[in-house]
Swiss-Prot record:
Monomer. Disulfide bonds: none annotated. Belongs to the glycosyl hydrolase 37 family. Residues 552-570 have a biased composition (Low complexity). The gene is treA. It catalyses: alpha,alpha-trehalose + H2O = alpha-D-glucose + beta-D-glucose. This is Periplasmic trehalase. Residues 1-34 form the signal peptide. GO terms for molecular function: alpha,alpha-trehalase activity. Residues 542-570 are annotated as: Disordered. Keywords: Glycosidase, Hydrolase, Periplasm, Signal. It comes from Citrobacter koseri (strain ATCC BAA-895 / CDC 4225-83 / SGSC4696). Substrate binds at residues 157, 164-165, 201, 210-212, 282-284, 315, 516.
């Protein structure tokens, strides 16, 4: 068994000077022990296999490009590549046969058939062991990265753990009283921070060049609900490493400059963006990316590839939010956009670093992190609020102004308690008027055909909206989001006996569409959010296993007439 590398010596701390005039941040790292430096990352399959990888993906040997990215070489990739170069031009060469001989392809997961007559809660509780994986070791050339403890995967084609998905899955594990699994998953992410200096998109070599929305602070906070301040002190070094990754290079930035994930605006405000260290097609979506880049010959392909990868880092892959033309994916420019949700999450990380530092008895660093959080909050209110529209939005580095598009990301400042109260009420009104649909919260109001646009609704965004609105006393709108999404989940489950990755919220009882792959079932984060919402709408003394027939009253709010579930045609 791998021992999690949760080392506590030589931890990272920051000295910060915060001037009132410019809020200039200066970071100085204390020297760290050499053994704590991240290891050299293993190479992804597109580099290991070079032309062989490109050829297999280019002829679309497999319907899903992720299949070959996850295939395991049976011997040294250099030897396989040498054999390929000798054989590929010979008469009668069969590429599929060559792949079958030299690689072990990922197995299709066994089709899970749930027992008949299960309630929604019973179905989810029965899925936890089905979705649990253990990978204490992996083959030398496997793209899968081993983790020390068991973990829960989303389901379907996703055979590995994913960063931001996992927090919402963990919410459900906690509701099911699987605190051991919650602790295991936090330990795994701590191990990744110690191993690689960041939490990758997922535990695959081809995901190491990027991260995902930074929810590690939320995970530690969740674990602390069960273990108390010991969890905060235990994972303080890893929280610091997470922060160092996102802020890398900030100390050398001049106003108007960017470095990887950090940007300094013209007025000296420091904020963050999504970034991938590579500018090549994604191995798991190789031909899709090449096709997208070829459709816009006016842009360098490498620029498009990095923006596609950076959108994958955002979790919103893909959305009109990142595009100049909602109907042309090749106009994507993720790296020139400062996302409101990312900066809200980093505000939370700074607040958690302050809390964990205080728990560890380090008041000086706690005060420094509080100052950083205050500076970021000011930056959010100054640059990520659209005063004309009345909602939080992203900042455009090219036009140097806040964007106009309303997306579900507008609720993240409410979710982390960073919003001004009067602005929170405006966000609630905009949400109700433009994003709230019969089946839940729409991701945007734009119908682009991309999966992170209308009419799709995603479980994590439903929870962010629900909790964010509750934080500011917008209980009726919060209950509307909860009730409508749960009704959607229940109707889909009643018809298909499964929970899915995303839902069409323009009605109830329909899975979502769009994206680079078919609709996936399972599904980790939907399971977790559904359990949280079930426990939100039903009193603790009388928990419900399925969605009640009528909408409950929002706590502490004047309540409209009870609404019955909307009937749908099977």
């Amino acid at each position: 068994m791998i021992t999690p590398a949760l080392r506590h010596s030589g931890t990272l701390s920051f000295a910060i000077k915060l001037t009132v005039a410019s809020t200039l941040l200066t970071f100085a790292s204390l020297s760290a022990h050499a053994e704590e430096q991240p290891a050299s990352p293993p190479q992804p399959p597109d580099i290991l296999l070079g032309p062989l990888f490109n050829d297999v993906q280019s002829v679309k040997l497999f319907p899903d490009q992720k299949t070959f990215a996850d295939a395991v070489p049976n011997s040294d990739p250099l030897m396989i590549l040498a054999d390929y170069r000798m054989q590929r031009n010979q008469s009668g060469f069969d590429l599929r046969h060559f792949v079958d001989v030299n690689f072990t392809l990922p197995k299709e997961g066994e089709k899970y058939v749930p027992p008949e007559g299960q309630s929604l809660r019973e179905h989810i509780d029965g899925l936890w062991p089905v979705l649990t994986r253990t990978t204490e070791s992996a083959g030398k050339w496997d793209s899968l990265l081993p983790l020390p403890e068991p973990y829960v995967v989303p389901g379907g084609r996703f055979r590995e753990v994913y960063y931001w998905d996992s927090y919402f899955t963990m919410l459900g594990l906690a509701e099911s009283d699987h605190w051991d699994k919650v602790a295991d998953m936090v330990a795994n992410f701590g191990y990744e921070l110690d191993s690689w200096g960041h939490i990758p998109n997922g535990n695959r070599t081809y995901y190491l060049s990027r991260s995902q929305p930074p929810f590690f602070a939320f995970m530690v906070e969740l674990l602390a609900q069960h273990e108390g301040d010991d969890a905060l002190k235990k994972y303080l070094p890893q929280l610091q490493k997470e922060y160092a990754y996102w802020m890398e290079g900030v100390e050398n930035l001049q106003p108007g400059e960017q470095n990887k994930r950090v940007v300094k605006l013209d007025d000296g405000t420091v904020l963050n963006r999504y970034w991938d260290d590579r500018d090549t097609p994604r191995p798991e979506s190789w031909m899709e990316d090449i096709t997208t880049a070829k459709s816009n010959p006016n842009r360098p392909a490498t620029e498009i590839y990095r923006d596609l990868r950076s959108a994958a880092a955002s979790g919103w892959d893909f959305s009109s939010r990142w595009m100049d033309d909602p109907n042309q994916l090749s106009t994507i420019r993720t790296t020139s956009i400062v996302p409101v949700d990312l900066n809200a999450l980093l505000y939370k990380l700074e607040k958690m670093l302050a809390r964990a530092s205080k728990a560890a008895g380090d008041d000086a660093n706690a005060n420094q992190y509080e100052a950083l959080a205050s500076a970021r909050q000011k930056g959010i209110e100054t640059h990520l609020w659209n005063n004309q529209e009345g909602w939080y939005a992203d900042y455009d580095l090219k036009s140097k102004k806040v964007r106009n598009q309303l997306t579900a990301a507008t609720l993240f400042p409410l979710y982390v308690n960073a919003a001004a109260k009067d602005r929170a009420s405006k966000v609630a009104a905009a949400t109700q008027a433009h994003l709230l649909q019969p089946g839940g919260l729409s991701t945007t109001s734009v119908k682009s055909g991309q999966q992170w646009d209308a009419p799709n609704g995603w479980a994590p965004l439903q929870w962010v909206a629900t909790e964010g609105l509750q934080n500011y006393g917008q209980d009726n709108v919060a209950m509307d989001v909860t009730w409508r999404f749960l009704t959607n989940v229940q109707h889909t489950y009643d018809r298909e006996q499964k929970l899915v990755e995303k839902y069409d919220v323009s009605s109830t009882g329909t899975g979502g569409g769009g994206g680079e792959y078919p609709l996936q079932d399972g599904f980790g984060w939907t399971n977790g959010v559904t359990l949280k919402m079930l426990d939100l709408i039903c009193p603790k003394e009388k928990p419900c296993d399925s969605v009640p027939a009528t909408r409950p009253a929002a706590p502490g709010a004047s309540q409209p007439a009870p609404q019955k579930q909307v009937e749908t045609t099977p």
